């Protein structure tokens, strides 16, 4: 890159002084300095006077110089704009190399706020693009809390009953499936209502409850299909 910049500067100098071109010996260093335009900085001129200097010195001189973008430069040669853009690119790279370590050190020293900012970044973008959707997301925890609160309010009488009278609460827990069944299927609920006295009787006597569990399929069959239940009784008597 330094060689290209040096070539551009030489072409610029030759194009600016083509009318006053003079042949000089090769060993002389004066032609290069005399061919340079007067508006170039003295630092570049000093670099060009000594051809033994390395291209890295030339690159440093161009990066440190401040070439003004005057109309005269644009009229004489469009190559100066390319030189200026190269200088700006070099400065931007140097600035980036200086700033990036500082940013990394700040991020490592204060990682928690940096991670929090990264987490909140989608929400900030959403609030900018769609404020209504952002507001709904902000209200979402309150909606969930309101739902849980309403459920607690529904269960509050049962909790109070369980604290005051555990026996009555246990009875309500036993009857709760029947209440749900009544809401879903009224015919099945009426069937369960017919069996309710048996449940209450067997709840007081666990041994009888076990017998009921064994006889429950036959009882349900007798309620749904009396003819089939009668046939099962006949078959059972014949077997025994």
Swiss-Prot record:
Q: What one GO molecular function would you report for this record?
A: nutrient reservoir activity
* Extent of the signal sequence: 1-21
Query: What further note is attached to this protein's record?
Result: The alpha zeins of 19 kDa and 22 kDa account for 70% of the total zein fraction. They are encoded by a large multigene family. Structurally, 22K and 19K zeins are composed of nine adjacent, topologically antiparallel helices clustered within a distorted cylinder.
Keywords attached to this entry: Repeat, Seed storage protein, Signal, Storage protein
Question: Which positions form S-S bridges?
Answer: none
UniProt keyword Cell division present: no
What is this protein called in UniProt?
Answer: Zein-alpha A20
Q: Which Pfam families would you find in this protein's record?
A: Zein (PF01559)
Similarity annotation: Belongs to the zein family.
Coiled coil start-end: none
Query: Could you name the domain of life of the organism this protein comes from?
Result: Eukaryota
Protein purpose: Zeins are major seed storage proteins.
């Amino acid at each position: 890159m330094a060689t290209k910049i040096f070539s551009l500067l030489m072409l610029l100098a030759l194009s600016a002084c083509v009318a006053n071109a003079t042949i000089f010996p090769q060993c002389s260093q004066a032609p290069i300095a005399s061919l340079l335009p007067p508006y170039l900085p003295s630092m570049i001129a000093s670099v060009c006077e000594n051809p033994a200097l390395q291209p890295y010195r030339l690159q440093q001189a161009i990066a440190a110089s401040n070439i003004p973008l005057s109309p005269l430069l644009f009229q004489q040669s469009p190559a100066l704009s390319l030189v200026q853009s190269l200088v700006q690119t070099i400065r931007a790279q140097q600035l980036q190399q200086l700033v990036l370590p500082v940013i990394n050190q700040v991020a490592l020293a204060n990682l928690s706020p940096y991670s929090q900012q990264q987490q909140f970044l989608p929400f900030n973008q959403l609030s900018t693009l769609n404020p209504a959707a952002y507001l709904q997301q902000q209200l979402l925890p309150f909606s969930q809390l309101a739902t849980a609160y309403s459920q607690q309010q529904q269960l509050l009488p049962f909790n109070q009953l369980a604290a005051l009278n555990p026996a009555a609460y246990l009875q309500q827990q036993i009857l709760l499936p029947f209440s749900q069944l009544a809401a879903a299927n009224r015919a099945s609920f009426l069937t369960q209502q017919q069996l309710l006295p048996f449940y209450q009787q067997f709840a007081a006597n666990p041994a009888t409850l076990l017998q009921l569990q064994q006889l429950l399929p036959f009882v349900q069959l007798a309620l749904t299909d009396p003819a089939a239940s009668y046939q099962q009784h006949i078959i059972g008597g014949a077997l025994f």
